[in-house]
Amino acid sequence: MDTLSVSGHKVHAPKGIGALFIRDSVRQTLCPPTWRHQERGLRPGTENTPYIVGLGVAAAQGQQKLRPRIAHIAALNRQLRAGLEELDGITLNSPDDAVGEIVNFSTGCINSQTFINYLNTRAVYVSGGSACDKGEPSHTLLAMGCADLTVRTALRVSFCADNTAEDVDALLAGVRDGLKELQHI
């Protein structure tokens, strides 16, 4: 691995902290970053020590719980996929060997934002894509060759260790009910 970036909130650390790893052999080929006027433009401002400690603690705790967390999320992923496969009109966009934390599927007939709003009223929260592509069609789905309708009706589910089988049941019930209620709009 040459580079790795980590957003703290993705590993249950404080929002606003992150880490960047760059292999020495790669770092030597890069131009140094510039950060305004601090430290001759080579360093950012004052580090947020509590957040740095929080990221370290979250990383250590995450490492200790990694295997059971992966198994738990894999079980939730299988439960969701099995439930979605039973619903007419649903297309699973995530391949079987995709990362376990994310499942992407399309309804094929109901705009993503309409379905997101419907699920929100049931306290079920999903997205229409990744945060970095908010409001834009999914570049990933387009690159996979998905049809425009598939992309416009896609929903993205993200799992974490705090999710439960009951959460998946609530999501599946919401999708099932939403398919019935929203097709007539």
Language-model-detected regions and their locations in the chain:
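Structural signature of PLP-dependent enzymes
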Residues: 59-81, 91-99
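Conserved C-terminal alpha-helix-loop-beta "cap" of PLP-dependent enzymes
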Residues: 103-155
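Short beta-strand-to-loop capping motifs
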Residues: 22, 105-109, 159-161
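A general structural signal for well-ordered alpha-helical segments in protein cores
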Residues: 14, 48-52, 59, 77, ...
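PLP-dependent enzyme catalytic core of the Aspartate aminotransferase-like
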Residues: 139-185
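Active-site PLP attachment segment
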Residues: 1-37, 44-57
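Thr-Gly-centered strand-to-loop micro-motif
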Residues: 6-8, 15, 42, 105-106, ...
